[in-house]
C-alpha cells in the first residue's frame, strides 16, 4: 500500500496489537481510558499509560488481574522494562537511522534545520520539518490588534449590568453584544467588577471583542450546569456554508501551494476554501488502521482550511494557489476536493478577562465537556490575557474547594488563523472520562497558535481532539502541570493525565520551547475513544523541557529535537501503544535542549519567511 507521507510503507507502517479492545462512547473523548504501558521509571512494578506503577505487579511476571481504572475491566500487562530514562537504552533504540544521540556540542543545530534551511529541505531518508510559520492570527504576519477604548459598549454604564456579582447580568451583557453586532462590530467593555452570568453568551457576528480591564479586575462567573453538556458559556459561533464540490484533477502534494481542478470559474481570489477527502478503505489501510478507524469512514473530512491567493484558468486543468502549503498528500483516489466556504466569523477577540464556571461538585460531574469559552468556525481571531479564577459557586469544603472550571476551558473548533496567547487556565472539577478537564483544546483546525499559556490541574491540559484535520498548529512556550485522569466523582484521583494529541492523525504540528511537568503524548491509542488510532504524524517536539514524560510514537516519522535533562523520553515500541514494526521516531539532541539553536523553531521560521517576502 502506498504511504501517504513522504516515507516508504515499510518505514511508516505503524500497527497496534489486534488484542486491543473496541470501546464505544460519546464524541470527543468517548471512552478515555488508560492504556497500560511497560514503563518502570517510577520504580518496581508494572506501569500504566501514564507511567504510574501498579503496586505488586512486576514487569517480569504476567499480571492478568490488573484493573483498568476507567473501564473496570481486566487488562494484561507483561513485558520488560522499556523506560527511555536509561541513556544506553535510548542510544540503542534510536540507532535505527536517527541522529545524534550521544554528545552534542554547545550551540548545536538540528541536522534537519541547517543555517541555510528552506521549506522542502530533507535528509537522505526523506525526513523533514514542516514550515510552521503560518500559525496564528493573520498567518503570523501581523501583530494582534490593539483594541481602542474610545468607543465601547459598556456593560455597566450603557446596559446596566450589576458589577457586584449579586444579580444575573446575562441579559445586560447579551444586549451589549447584540448592539455591537448590529453596529457592524465593536468592543463590549467590562469595567472593574464581578459579573454573575446565569445563562449563556452567544456572539454570532464578526468584529466583536469582549474586553475587560485585566483578568483580576474584570471577572465573569457562570452558574449554569444543567443542559450545558457539549456547549460553551461564551460561544463565538460562525455559520459556515459549503459550496459546490470541486474534485482535484491530480494529487495535491504535501508542501505544495497549488491544487488543480477542471473548472475553477466558481472560485474567487480571497475566498475561503476547505481541502479534504473521503476516509476510504484504502486510506485507512494505508495507515494500518483497518478495524480501528471507523467513526469517520466513508465520509468526506476537512483537512486544510485555506484561502485562495490566485487562480490560473489558462492552464489545463485550472491551477488554484492557496495561502498555506498542504501538509499531507491529498489523493484523487480518496476523492480529494475543494469546497468553497462562507460564513466564518473574523476579527473577534476576548482579552483581559477573568472567567470561571465551577459549580457544585456533583453538578459538575453530571455534565460532559462544558467549556467556559469556545471559538467555532472563526478565522483571524484571538484570545489574549484571559485567566480562570476560583468561582464563588465552587464548593467551600470537600472535593472541589477553590475550583475554577466546571470541566473544560477554551475550545477552538473548525477554525483557522487563531491566536490564544498569554492565558492561564486551571483547576477543573470534572476530570473524568467523556471528554472532561481539557483546558486548552483544538479540534479540526489549522494554523492555530497557543503562545505563552499555562494549564494546571486539568485532565489533559493541552489537547488536540476528535476528528481529522488538525494541521499546522503551534504550541509555543506553553507550560503544563498537574494533569490527572480522574476516575469518577467519588474518586477524582488517578493516573497522570498527559497533554496529548488525542484522535485521528493530527498532522504537521509543532510543540515548541514548552515545559511539561506531567507529560505530552503522541501515540497510537488504538480503539480507545471510538477508535482514535494513530493520533499524529510528522509532528515536531522542539526544545522541550520539564520533569514529565514525552512520548512520541507517531505514524511515519515524528520528531523529537532537543530535550531537557530531567525530561523522560519514550520512543520505542510498546505492547499496547506506539509502533509494532520496531522503529522509533527521530531523536536528536537528547538532554541537550539548553544549547539548541534556534531556541524557537516557529519564531525562527517566521522571521526567515518574512525576511524573504517583498
Q: Language-model segments: which ranges?
A:
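Catalytic domains of carbohydrate-active enzymes that cleave complex glycans
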Residues: 479-483, 489-496, 507-614
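Short glycine/acidic-rich loop motifs that flank beta-strands on beta-rich extracellular proteins
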Residues: 185, 198-200, 219-223, 359-364, ...
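Residue-level signal for WD-repeat beta-propeller blades
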Residues: 182, 189, 202-204, 228, ...
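Extracellular "leader-to-stem" segments immediately downstream of a signal peptide or signal-anchor
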Residues: 83-84, 88-191, 196-361, 365, ...
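Right-handed parallel beta-helix
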Residues: 178-181, 207, 216, 336-394, ...
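Ser/Thr-rich, Pro/Gly/Ala-heavy low-complexity intrinsically disordered linkers and tails
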Residues: 1-103
Amino acid at each position: 500500500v502506498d504511504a501517504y507521507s513522504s516515507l516508504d510503507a515499510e518505514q511508516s507502517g505503524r500497527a497496534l496489537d489486534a488484542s486491543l479492545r473496541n470501546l464505544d462512547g460519546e464524541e470527543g473523548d468517548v471512552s478515555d481510558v488508560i492504556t497500560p504501558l511497560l514503563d518502570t521509571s517510577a520504580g518496581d512494578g508494572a506501569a500504566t499509560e501514564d507511567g504510574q506503577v501498579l503496586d505488586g505487579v512486576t514487569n517480569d511476571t504476567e499480571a492478568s488481574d490488573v484493573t483498568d481504572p476507567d473501564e473496570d475491566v481486566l487488562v494484561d500487562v507483561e513485558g520488560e522494562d522499556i523506560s527511555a530514562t536509561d541513556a544506553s537504552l535510548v542510544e540503542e533504540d534510536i540507532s535505527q537511522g536517527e541522529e545524534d544521540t550521544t554528545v552534542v556540542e554547545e550551540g548545536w543545530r538540528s541536522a534537519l534545520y541547517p543555517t541555510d534551511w528552506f521549506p522542502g529541505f530533507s535528509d537522505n531518508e526523506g525526513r523533514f520539518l514542516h514550515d510552521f510559520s503560518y500559525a496564528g492570527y493573520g498567518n503570523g504576519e501581523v501583530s494582534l490588534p490593539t483594541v481602542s477604548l474610545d468607543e465601547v459598549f459598556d456593560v455597566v454604564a450603557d446596559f446596566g449590568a450589576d458589577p457586584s456579582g449579586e444579580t444575573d447580568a446575562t441579559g445586560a451583557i447579551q444586549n451589549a453584544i447584540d448592539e455591537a453586532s448590529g453596529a457592524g462590530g465593536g468592543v463590549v467593555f467590562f469595567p472593574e467588577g464581578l459579573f454573575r452570568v446565569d445563562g449563556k453568551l452567544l456572539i454570532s457576528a464578526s468584529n466583536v471583542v469582549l474586553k475587560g480591564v485585566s483578568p483580576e479586575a474584570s471577572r465573569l462567573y457562570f452558574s449554569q450546569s444543567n443542559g450545558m453538556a457539549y456547549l460553551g458559556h461564551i460561544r463565538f459561533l460562525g455559520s459556515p456554508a459549503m459550496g459546490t464540490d470541486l474534485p482535484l484533477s491530480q494529487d495535491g502534494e504535501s508542501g505544495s501551494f497549488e491544487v488543480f481542478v477542471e473548472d475553477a470559474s466558481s472560485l474567487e481570489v480571497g475566498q475561503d476554501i476547505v481541502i479534504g477527502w473521503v476516509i476510504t478503505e484504502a486510506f485507512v489501510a494505508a495507515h494500518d488502521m483497518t478495524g480501528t478507524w471507523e467513526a469517520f469512514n466513508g465520509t468526506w473530512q476537512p483537512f486544510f482550511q485555506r484561502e485562495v491567493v490566485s487562480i490560473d484558468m489558462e492552464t489545463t486543468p485550472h491551477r488554484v494557489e492557496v495561502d498555506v502549503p498542504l501538509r499531507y498528500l491529498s489523493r484523487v483516489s480518496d476523492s480529494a476536493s475543494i469546497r468553497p466556504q462562507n460564513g466564518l466569523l473574523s476579527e473577534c477577540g476576548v482579552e483581559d478577562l477573568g472567567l470561571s464556571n465551577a459549580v457544585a461538585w456533583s453538578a459538575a460531574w453530571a455534565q460532559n465537556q462544558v467549556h467556559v469559552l469556545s471559538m467555532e468556525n472563526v478565522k483571524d481571531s484571538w484570545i489574549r490575557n484571559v485567566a480562570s479564577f476560583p468561582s464563588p459557586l465552587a464548593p467551600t469544603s470537600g472535593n472541589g474547594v477553590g475550583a475554577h472550571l466546571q470541566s473544560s476551558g477554551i475550545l477552538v473548533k473548525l477554525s483557522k488563523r487563531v491566536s490564544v496567547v498569554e492565558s492561564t487556565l486551571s483547576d477543573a472539577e470534572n476530570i473524568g472520562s467523556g471528554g472532561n478537564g481539557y483546558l486548552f483544546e483544538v479540534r479540526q483546525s489549522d494554523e492555530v497558535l497557543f503562545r505563552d499559556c499555562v494549564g494546571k490541574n486539568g485532565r489533559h491540559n493541552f489537547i488536540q481532539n476528535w476528528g481529522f484535520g488538525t494541521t499546522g498548529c503551534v504550541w509555543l512556550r506553553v507550560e503544563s502541570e498537574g494533569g490527572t485522569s480522574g476516575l469518577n466523582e467519588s474518586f477524582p484521583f488517578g493516573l497522570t493525565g498527559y497533554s496529548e494529541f488525542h484522535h485521528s492523525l493530527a498532522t504537521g504540528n509543532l510543540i515548541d520551547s514548552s515545559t511539561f511537568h506531567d507529560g505530552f503524548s503522541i501515540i497510537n491509542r488504538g480503539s480507545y475513544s471510538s477508535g482514535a488510532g494513530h493520533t499524529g504524524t510528522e509532528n515536531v517536539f522542539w526544545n522541550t523541557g520539564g520533569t514529565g514524560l514525552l512520548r512520541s510514537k507517531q505514524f511515519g516519522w515524528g520528531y523529537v529535537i532537543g530535550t531537557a535533562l530531567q525530561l523522560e523520553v519514550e520512543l520505542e515500541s510498546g505492547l499496547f501503544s506506539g509502533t509494532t514494526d520496531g522503529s522509533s521516531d527521530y531523536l536528536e539532541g537528547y538532554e541537550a535542549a539548553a544549547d539548541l539553536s534556534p531556541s524557537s523553531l516557529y519564531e525562527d521560521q517566521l522571521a526567515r519567511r518574512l525576511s524573504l517576502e517583498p
